[in-house]
Amino acid sequence: MEQSLMEKLTILADSAKYDVACTSSGASRAAKAGSMGSCYAPGCCHAFTADGRCVSLLKVLMTNCCAFDCSYCVNRRSNDAPRATFSPWELAELTIEFYRRNYIEGLFLSSAVLVSPDYTTERMLKTLRLLRNEYHFGGYIHAKAIPGTSPELLEQLGFLADRLSVNVELPSESSLKLLAPDKGRHSIFRPMKQIAVEGAANREELTLYRKAPRFAPAGQSTQMIVGASPETDHHILKLTEGMYQKYSLKRVFYSAYIPVAEDTRLPALDTKPPLLREHRLYQADWLLRFYQFKADEILDADHPNFNPYLEPKCNWAVQHYGLFPVDVNRASFEMLLRVPGIGPKSARRIWHARKQASLGLDELKRMGVVLKRAQYFITCRGFAGAHPGRGSAGRERITSALIDPTVFSGGVEQLSLFSPPAVDKLVAQGVPTHAAQKLVREEAVQCLARAL
């Protein structure tokens, strides 16, 4: 029986929920006369823009009928699930109707592999050509490039979309071979390299010809599944660092693995998604991009996984406590960035303000420094650094100031990094959740104090 448009939308929007796209668009194309939509300062997928607005997009698959059989994917060939496929005309018209009703401001288009990567990409191209050329849609479009797509089709896709992304999926080639045998390292990184090279060439061309067509003006991103394979956090972070450097990625997204199938190669169906691990990866990713950290400084062979109780930056400060305290009136900008409680904005404010006058605690507080954390790592005018005291009491005071409160306030599910979760174990023994969180926090503080 032929499916209605609403039935297709229900199936294909649900199938797209595992794709991550929570980011601002990064494009700055203004609206033109006779066109619909604008890319000026917006974001996508319920993201908050710099001016505080929350914008949305239609996130949907072209089809969930897949020729590949990736064991971790809900759309894999062997999965017994409802299937649907949009025609290019249906999807283009649906996007425009949603836009006219002010439901969305853009489109996030991905797809399972229907017949072959090239055949699927050709259908995506037809959809985007209809939107751009027939409907004159000027809004944000994020297109997922299919691994294995020919360079010619990928180039055409880049001139129609604002952002492209090729999902890495898994952190190592061995995991790809085990869990996604239809995909290979070359089929993923070749299009990544092409997007980076063509993007750089296009930017050069735009300096000479302002009206030259723009190739993926918002750059490229990728997504990695965390928890489906045995790689360490250090391995994942090194891969992330390499991709940022080699392929000029705008973002790397991390997705905590949600079990969707019973398979001996994958975690059991009752395994909770490693949400805390995903959160730590985003924090470390931020350090790579904005705090001038290297992956090997955050984690190493001796400490290959994140500390569940401390944010990566605080964990680094604890491990290198001998470098502190630093004088904020003399320290380098790079060292200011490494002080817990000081971020890029407050570091820049300190850097400029101290040229005019020596800074004290009052000035630092007005600049946004979180003194609860920073006080143990800095000195300034009239302040010789907080003295937490000697022995275990002093160490516990520092640890209590640094410990990540979200680990305990987020509930039992946030602790899914542990095996078994400490809070979960106490709750199973009859201890109330709030009391269990308090006990685990106290134990964590004592353990971290001993590490100091």
Q: What would you call each of these model-derived segments?
A:
Residues 362-366, 375:
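Short Lys/Arg-enriched helix C-cap and helix-to-coil transition segments
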Residues 1-68, 72-222, 226-230, 261, ...:
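Conserved Radical SAM active-site core
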Residues 172, 187-264, 273-299, 370:
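Conserved C-terminal portion of the radical SAM core fold
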Residues 265-337, 373-422, 426, 451:
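Long, highly charged, low-complexity intrinsically disordered interaction regions
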Residues 1-65, 370, 378, 386-409, ...:
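Flexible, acidic/Gly-rich N-terminal and inter-domain linker regions that tether
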Residues 353-354:
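Residue-level signature of tetratricopeptide-repeat
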